[in-house]
Amino acid sequence: MSQPAENWFLTAVVAGMLAACASSEDKPVEPNLLPTNYKQEILDTLSRTLGYPTNVREAYISDPALGPVGKDQRYMACVRYNARDANNHYAGSTDRIAYFYGGHLNQLIKASKEQCGNAAYKPFPELEKLCLATKCE
């Protein structure tokens, strides 16, 4: 074999090996898996995003249910709570909507009355008891 032919052949073999490695068959994510750990994922998110995540009052949550998100259906849950503001005063009740994708929390954003106005809320004592100190464990 001549030198250019050997180079071409070697390049083709290496390219084929790299292509075989790159074509892993990842399973597509099922977007509408029922979120089983939704309360903990919401607690984790609120503990990072609330200014004062402890001593939350009047905490409620709805069970995840399929609802419309654009043209798709996704699991969502509503959360209502009264947390303290930057001045350490209770700010009043806040409604948030949690969107789930593939069984995990994807977004937790402010909810409109249309989104959570008819939610079947139940007490969420885990949020009211949230404690971040090591002595809490």
PLM regions and their residue ranges:
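Cystatin/cathelin-like cysteine-protease inhibitor module
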Residues: 22-137
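Bacterial N-terminal signal peptides that target proteins for export
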Residues: 1-9
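C-terminal motif of bacterial Sec signal peptides marking the signal peptidase cleavage site
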Residues: 17-20
